[in-house]
Regions:
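Acidic, turn/loop-rich segments in luminal/extracellular domains of secretory-pathway
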Residues: 1-37, 42-53, 58-134, 139-150, ...
Length: 254
């Protein structure tokens, strides 16, 4: 019907004596509803963590001119998406995470006004975008009173991007980070008598320049010796007992 709705046919009748009669007929083709075919999607990739992102424009073929097509979604990740004004998009307040799924699968069903339908499954590629660090841990938050330079603890940053490298800076100029270790700089010392805790902020920055700040409170432990004198030439003599005044102090003493 879509190619030609009527056909002209001439029928010729011949009797036994050879006489003939011809008559022309017009044959009309009745239009029958046909299902949509060949669902298309103009693009099939979105950036991760982009809530409500438009994937692409949906289209379909239907031999019935002027037919209206509606779309429905299903499949493994169908609930992540919706169709708005013919565009396939992530729902608002919904985003995809490359680290969780690098590809999302959605099945699109196109239904015409006569109720006939066809479906097609699309793979939506999620493009990895750099994620900022989300946390910083320190292996110990205690240091010894009287410490003159030395390592406080090892810093570790959390980041969803695997294989990421980090740099660190510290808000307190007495400290520095060397090879991931928080250290008291040479020429500096901490004393329990003047500060029992030290609060500082560590900033970690990934290779793409995204950063994260975290505040730490370091406990300064006081070491006391019961006796500080001993006789000369008395190797092995016990000088006194060591004690630390802070029951929460966790640094290792050797």
């Amino acid at each position: 019907y879509e190619n030609q709705s009527t056909y002209a046919v001439t029928v010729t009748s011949t009797d036994g004596s050879g006489s003939t009669f011809a008559q022309s007929f017009s044959v009309s083709i009745n239009d029958v509803n046909e299902a949509p075919t060949n669902i298309t999607l103009s693009a099939a990739a979105i950036d991760e963590n982009d809530s409500g992102a438009v994937v692409g424009t949906l289209g379909s073929s239907d031999e019935d001119a002027g037919d209206t097509v509606t779309y429905a979604l299903s499949g493994s990740h169908g609930l992540y998406f919706e169709v708005v004004n013919g565009q396939l998009k992530l729902k608002n307040n919904t985003s995809a995470n490359f680290e969780d799924n690098a590809t999302l699968s959605v099945t699109v069903t196109a239904t015409d006004s006569g109720g006939l339908a066809t479906n097609q499954t699309f793979s939506i590629n999620i493009t990895d975008v750099n994620d900022a660090p989300t946390a910083i841990q320190i292996s110990t938050n205690s240091l010894v009173s009287g410490l003159v330079a030395g390592t406080v603890g090892t810093l570790t940053a959390t980041d969803e991007d695997s294989g990421e490298s980090f740099t660190y800076t510290v808000s307190d100029d007495r400290f520095e980070v060397v090879d991931g270790q928080l250290k008291l700089k040479s020429g500096n010392t901490v004393e329990y008598d003047t500060e029992t805790t030290i609060t500082l902020t560590v900033t970690t920055t990934d290779a793409a320049g995204e950063s994260f700040d975290q505040e730490f409170t370091l406990k300064v432990g006081s070491i006391q010796i019961s006796s500080t004198t001993f006789a000369e030439n008395s190797a092995g003599t016990v000088v006194g007992d060591l004690s630390i005044t802070d029951p929460d102090f966790t640094a290792n003493i050797s």
